[in-house]
From Swiss-Prot:
Residues 1-28, 218-230 form a propeptide. Residues 1-45 are annotated as: Disordered. Changing residue 29 to V: Abolishes binding to Diap2 but has no effect on Drice processing or activity. The gene is Drice. This is Caspase drICE. InterPro entries: Caspase-like_dom_sf, Caspase_cys_AS, Caspase_his_AS, Pept_C14, Pept_C14_caspase, Pept_C14_p10, Pept_C14_p20, Pept_C14A. Changing residue 211 to A: No effect on binding to Diap2 but may affect stability of complex formed with Diap2. The active site is at residues 169, 211.
Length: 339
């Protein structure tokens, strides 16, 4: 839903703290919002899973047990067993697929003003990090699925990793294509090690800019206290099929995600700024910690005409199954070849 008042919405549109003169904050939730507050999503609830509805639970939903569909899974070892860092010395960095959703056929969904700014900024920084970037605009679900299936079917042997970014409306466990909602595990499941062997042991990165619900985070004011002044690396080894995933959500489950109509979403602004400044220096988890810090500290919604949406906060949510340190080392400085 995009709650709109004075240019602000919840994907939601927001502004940096200290810039109250530009009230352009909105959210990426579902439904509509009037002066009375957030609207309902209209989503059909999915069945519960013992692992929950978050990223880990959704990945587990896509798992086929050996008893039902056994096959011997073997993939080429691209990194030594106990290497501290991922091998980022392949010929190519890898694919980066950006699904940018601005307009929708679903009547309850408003257009996402500001998303093209996010898309342009993300495209630029990913190219600087040597990704091969492809942008898909306002795709229907069947086209998203076809694109993802094709990407997963390619030979990624000469690539370091793969990255998928989705910018859209959403609810907890769901995200919207142009025409309908879908579960995010419908995307991730194509890239598990048993389904995409050429990406086995390599990072699979997903960045989701969308609401995960309609709850608001009013924040807490922090005040200063008055008193304050690993075996043989050459041997083969097995890995779980769901290893080496990282899923970065713009917000925590159940909550709004804010977007500024002129500068883009808080999360993408922060992610792009950190990738541009530190993408080749810091490892990804350290970098994402600073992304969380930027979103949490530097931004606050400005919707004075809608008091219940005014001065709200946001914090991204990172789910990681990475098994090594990931750093986007400079391709021109890294030696050629693979481990």
């Amino acid at each position: 839903m995009d709650a709109t008042n004075n240019g602000e919405s919840a994907d939601q549109v927001g502004i940096r703290v200290g810039n109250p003169e530009q009230p352009n904050d909105h959210t990426d939730a579902l439904g509509s919002v009037g002066s009375g507050g957030a609207g309902s999503s209209g989503l059909v609830a999915g069945s519960s899973h013992p692992y929950g509805s978050g990223a880990i639970g959704q990945l587990a939903n896509g798992y086929s047990s050996p008893s039902s569909s056994y096959r011997k899974n073997v993939a080429k070892m691209v990194t030594d067993r106990h290497a501290a860092e991922y091998n980022m010395r392949h010929k190519n960095r890898g694919m980066a697929l950006i699904f940018n959703h601005e307009h929708f056929e679903v009547p309850t969904l408003k257009s996402r003003a500001g998303t093209n700014v996010d898309c342009e900024n993300l495209t630029r920084v990913l190219k600087q990090l040597d990704f091969e970037v492809t942008v898909y605009k306002d795709c229907r679900y069947k086209d998203i699925l076809r694109t993802i299936e094709y990407a997963a079917s390619q030979n990624h042997s000469d690539s370091d990793c793969i990255l998928v970014a989705i910018l859209s409306h959403g609810e907890m466990g769901y995200i919207y294509a142009k025409d309908t909602q879908y579960k995010l595990d419908n995307i991730w499941s194509f890239f598990t090690a048993n389904h995409c062997p050429s990406l086995a042991g390599k990072p699979k990165l997903f960045f989701i800019q969308a609401c995960q619900g309609d709850r608001l985070d009013g924040g807490v004011t922090m005040q200063r206290s008055q008193t304050e002044t690993d075996g043989d690396s050459s041997m083969s080894y097995k890995i779980p099929v769901h290893a080496d995933f990282l899923i970065a959500y713009s917000t925590v489950p159940g909550f709004y995600s804010w977007r500024n109509t002129t500068r883009g979403s808080w999360f993408m602004q922060s992610l792009c700024a950190e990738l541009a400044a530190n993408g080749k220096r810091l490892d990804i988890l350290t970098l994402l910690t600073f992304v969380c810090q930027r979103v949490a500290v530097d931004f606050e919604s400005c919707t004075p005409d809608t008091p219940e949406m005014h001065q709200q906060k946001q914090i991204p949510c990172i789910t990681t199954m990475l098994t090594r340190i990931l750093r986007f080392s400079d391709k021109q400085l890294a030696p050629a070849g693979r481990v």
